[in-house]
Structure formats: C-alpha cells, structure tokens
C-alpha cells in the first residue's frame, strides 16, 4: 500500500508543535510494516542548511492557482529510510517562520495544489493521501473539484487528521475564486463556508473520505459546543467517518536508558539513579540542590490552552509550599511575564527559561519529580507521555488525550500513573497538587507510582496498527 503524508511541518526539518513529531515518527512505523510511505512538506528557509544541501532537485513545473500559473520545484531527500519531498517556491516559503503571514491562504492553497500536480511528475500514485490540519485541508477539496475526471487521481482516497481544531485556516470569501479557483457551489454549509468566510479546515472535514483526530476523548469532545470551535454541529453530522486514534511517542528518542542529553541514564529497574539527574538539573539552573524538595517541571508553549490561567491564579499558593518549579517554553507575553515575575520573587524556587532547548527539555523530564499539565483542552498531548517514560509524575486535567493516558493513582489498589482533576478550576488544581505532594512525601508509595508510570507503553506500535486497519478498511471495504 502506498501512502503519502502531506503536512506543513515535520521532524527533523521544521517543528512548531506536536504535529511535527507525528510526521517524524508515524511514517517510519508504517514503513516497518511494509507500507510504501512518503512525506511531502514545504521547503522552508527555516529548514537547517545541513538538510537543504542534501536535497536533490527532481523537476520544476507551473502550478495553476486561481488565474495564475506559479513556479514550483520539487526536491527529494531520504532520511531515516523515508523519502521526503519538498515543494519549493521561494516567494511563499523563503521567509522567517512558518505561519502567521497575510497570504497564508495563498501559500497553503499553492502547497496543496502543488502536491496533487507533482504526483504524476514523480511517478508516485498513492492509494491514500494522509492530510494533517488545515494547511492541507484543500487537498481533498481539489481532488473533488479539479481532478475527479482525471484517471490518475480517481482511485486516490484521503484521510484528514485534526491535530488541533482551534486552528482552522479561515480567510475572506474573495479567495474562493481568486485563489482556489472554485465556484460558488463550494461555498455552502456542506462546503467551505464558515460564517461568511472560507475555512480550509471545513474543506478537510467535508471532502475527505475519513476523519481522524489524535485521541479518542478528543474525537468525542469536538462534537460538543464547549470544544467544537463552532464546528461541533458539522462534526456530529460527520461522526460516522470520525475516528480517534491516540498519538504515540518515539521511544528511541525518549528513552532514559539511552538518552544522550541527560546526566545519568536510568531505567525502571535503576530508577534510583534519577536523583542524580535531579541534582544536575538543580545545579545547572542555579536552584538549591535539595534532594528532599519536589521539583515541578513544565515544557510547554506558554499559551492559554495549557491551563496557565489556573497556574497563575494559585502560583503564589504553590510557591508558598516547599517546592521548586522549572519552566521551559515561550508564547504569549503576559504568561512569559507571569513566570519571570515569579522567578524574581522566588529566586530559590523558580527557574524560568523563555526559549526552547531540546537538551534542557530532556533534562527537565529526567530531573523533575512531578510534571504540570493542567490544560484547558488537549487534543492528545505528548509531554505527559514523555514525562511518564522518565518517571516524572503528571498532574493533568481530564481532557482529550490527557484523560486517555493518565490513570489517577488509587491509594487502595496501588494502580495509577499520575494525578488528575476534572473541572477547569484553580482550587481543584491546587488541591490535586497538594495531594500529589503528600504522596511524594511517602517514599514507598511514590516508588510504586513511578514504577507504574515508567512501565506504560505509549510507543507508536498500537496507534500505527489502528491507522493500518483504517487504511485497509477504507481501500478494501469502501467505507468512507
């Protein structure tokens, strides 16, 4: 079976979020099961030069977009056994950053149209194009509108994965004809129309053969007004083709037993060595080296989705306790300022690192005792799975993938791998945090919780098998 992954970012080339991790991992696992899997991305100037220098140009051609024909080059690079293709157009992709430009509608409409145009030119006819998030939402639309009578494309099926419904790619109606080259028949409730504008996300939802999202709970949540981002009615209507499949993590990269980024390697059997990583983390971040104090870790975008409103409401209450807090990430300025202010007021308790550093991220997972993730919503979440692997016990809100991966500790049965609370309420969060600390102080119980956490399997194996089953069902049973 031939599968083409189409996405706007992917590890190791460019990354702004969890989507890139999926693109860097899932294709490899499918390939190991005998699939011919390839990936196609924009050729951003942000891609490190060490990769750009290895790319081989295959061809170039003109892509029709609205009333124009635009240059497109296609380049190829094999990495970790996977063939990656890169769509090249310097006007659209030679910029600092990936998203947030005024012409994003044009940029990603071009990308989606170029993907379809390039396939016969590289002699690759996939059975399935697996599209990811709004940036690739027009691929299934274009297949229906521009390519349905072309024999090359008639048997291609599409899967569209929603990684985060909050980002929908909504643009003025004028792009319908000027950029997309579509008639008014595509501007309706069963098409691209979204409150008088054009939604790329709706293109993916309405015109793809199968919809997936990145956890079972999130697939249920987005059909509700609270989480549906004004598309809940449409998603309820399309629920027959909607499937929730939990993301996995790359257990080779996130393996405390072999991780080159951390001070001392350890495993579930040698978890006593974890304390050395804690001491190292405290030392490099200039925190008092106290083995008895619980270290809370956060590696996160600093945005409202991550529950920072809750943390801000009770931050002084938390820091009045005998704890340390380590934060790594960047995002909205008022949250950055909130943590900076806390580090000035509590210099012996708080280390704030407004940036992203991969090595420091690994060291926080390895050196922290408790991992904070009280998200307002979380489609899947990878950080809590990584934290479990390193024996850092998550405190989460029961939403999306957090609900699917964290089993609250039961002191009567000894089961559970973390702690959770249900309502988006600061006092509930604070109560859960204090309860977690009380178990941390009971070292025998804490050892059981850490052991439970580190034996969890969130590799891609089970998730990749579910995607395989979905692909086969789509192709061989004709279910759409």
UniProtKB/Swiss-Prot annotation:
Pfam family, one: Glyco_transf_5
Record InterPro entries: Glyco_trans_1, GS/SS, Starch_synth_cat_dom
EC number: 2.4.1.21
Keywords annotated in UniProt: Glycogen biosynthesis, Glycosyltransferase, Transferase
Reactions that this protein is recorded to catalyse: [(1->4)-alpha-D-glucosyl](n) + ADP-alpha-D-glucose = [(1->4)-alpha-D-glucosyl](n+1) + ADP + H(+)
CDD domains recorded: GT5_Glycogen_synthase_DULL1-like (cd03791)
Gene3D superfamilies per the UniProt record, alphabetical: Glycogen Phosphorylase B (3.40.50.2000)
Function: Synthesizes alpha-1,4-glucan chains using ADP-glucose.
Protein name per UniProt: Glycogen synthase
Record organism: Desulforamulus reducens (strain ATCC BAA-1160 / DSM 100696 / MI-1)
